[in-house]
Amino acid sequence: SSAASDVYKRQLHYGDVPAFTPERWDFTITGLVAHPQRWTYEQFSKLPHVTETYDIHCVTGWSKLDNTWEGVRVRDLLRPATVLPKGQFVMVHGDEDYTTNVPLSLLLQEGALIANKHNGEPLTPEHGWPYRLVVPGPYFWKSAKWVRGLELMETNERGFWERYGYHNDGDPWKEERYSWQER
């Protein structure tokens, strides 16, 4: 096994792994939308799932190339919600009050998924089961585990790690790791 795959097996999250109860799980789209959306786990798991392949980059310095993800396209989830013109930013909400912020434009990319499989296998609880956000481009902390909802917002408010000193954008090609690097 490669060093990158060994690193991927380590704990790379804050706090405990949330317990998953299918009857209590839901996924919502709220905020600056004309039609807020809510799916139960059963409903969400029946939505069309697609496969995308891209690299992931961790803020700690490692990358894992050619990852295949299976899940629901974020832009397909946003379509029935009808994002209002002022809703240009998204607060991604996960279990345990975890949040991360991304521009709406990143989630409208074809590759942005709410994923339940990685490299053909169901996600493990440690890696976000039953669903995690995966966004091609930024450092992987922006791809929130245990994702439960998207809140459309007018302003780019900071999420959990961004409030604790991580860069607001997290572009690995610009090495945007820390908030002190912001201009």
Describe the role of every protein-language-model region.
Residues 17-68:
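A glycine-rich, hydrophobic loop/mini-helix early in the fold
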Residues 86-122, 132:
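A contiguous pocket-lining binding segment that forms or flanks enzyme active sites
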Residues 1-8:
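Short, small-residue-biased leader/transition segments that mark boundaries at the very start
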Residues 10-14:
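N-terminal post-signal-peptidase region of extra-cytosolic proteins
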Residues 150-151, 156-183:
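Low-complexity, Gly/Ser/Thr/Pro-rich intrinsically disordered linker/tail segments
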Residues 73, 113-117, 122-155:
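Active-site scaffold segments
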Residues 50-102:
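Mid-length scaffold segments of soluble, non-membrane domains
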Residues 24-26, 53, 71, 87-89, ...:
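Extracellular structured ligand-interaction cores
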